[in-house]
Amino acid sequence: MTMTITVSIFGQFFPETLLFIPMNLFSIVFALSWIAFIYPTNWAPSRFQSIWASFRANVLEMIFQNTSPNTAPWAGLITTVFIVILSANVLGLFPYAFTATSHISLTYSLGFPIWMAVNILGFYLAFNSRLSHLVPQGTPSALIPLMVWIETLSLFAQPIALGLRLAANLTAGHLLIFLLSTAIWLLSSSLMVSSIPIFVIFVLLFILEIGVACIEAYVFTALVHFYLQQNV
């Protein structure tokens, strides 16, 4: 008797339940509670909190290097966004975990409000200067109406690209992991030796996905800082 199991390739992106607790809720709560844990609340921080403080200082130095002092008040917000995205990305690599940042509903919920706030602040502080960016310097008079439309569209495309880049890269990586792990499972049941090269590729790909999870969190926050630097 042969039993057939049908597995959807996109089924891993649907939230599972553990003890009647939705895994999507668990992953988001874990990412947010992680912030409260890593920030020291006592006079003598622990060894882990000291290591985290050094890591946070290095991240802030990478993101805020060669920047104006006007962006300093935004350091706390950008650092928090980085921690939340990094925690959700890494947590999604665990088996049966829900990758919240692979859904554009979450990535747009993070990117669009920040982009909107930054641009509203930019137009409020320097309205004429922001309008002048819609027409690049040296543009012929005949092309000014066209350039205004192009620059306006590129401006509104920023939050779309910001959220879509994060979700698409994580989705692609998880699909590759799913396909390779399925191939290993099918080959190991028939011929163990043939699954060894695929397993080696799988391990290397998983290590690469850990790096992608960290890099995507950095790219998201670096782009947010870039948009902030254009407006403040």
From Swiss-Prot:
Name of the protein this chain belongs to: ATP synthase subunit a
Name of the gene: ATP6
Family indicated by similarity: Belongs to the ATPase A chain family.
Taxonomic path: Eukaryota, Metazoa, Echinodermata, Eleutherozoa, Echinozoa
Mode of membrane association: Multi-pass membrane protein
Transmembrane segments: 18-38, 74-94, 107-127, 142-162, 173-193, 195-215
Quaternary context: F-type ATPases have 2 components, CF(1) - the catalytic core - and CF(0) - the membrane proton channel. CF(1) has five subunits: alpha(3), beta(3), gamma(1), delta(1), epsilon(1). CF(0) has three main subunits: a, b and c.
Function text: Mitochondrial membrane ATP synthase (F(1)F(0) ATP synthase or Complex V) produces ATP from ADP in the presence of a proton gradient across the membrane which is generated by electron transport complexes of the respiratory chain. F-type ATPases consist of two structural domains, F(1) - containing the extramembraneous catalytic core and F(0) - containing the membrane proton channel, linked together by a central stalk and a peripheral stalk. During catalysis, ATP synthesis in the catalytic domain of F(1) is coupled via a rotary mechanism of the central stalk subunits to proton translocation.
PANTHER family, per the entry: ATP SYNTHASE SUBUNIT A
Localization, UniProt: Mitochondrion inner membrane
A Pfam family matched in the record: ATP-synt_A
Alphabetized UniProt keyword annotations: ATP synthesis, CF(0), Hydrogen ion transport, Ion transport, Membrane, Mitochondrion, Mitochondrion inner membrane, Transmembrane, Transmembrane helix, Transport
Any one GO molecular function term: proton-transporting ATP synthase activity, rotational mechanism
Listed GO CC annotations: mitochondrial inner membrane; proton-transporting ATP synthase complex
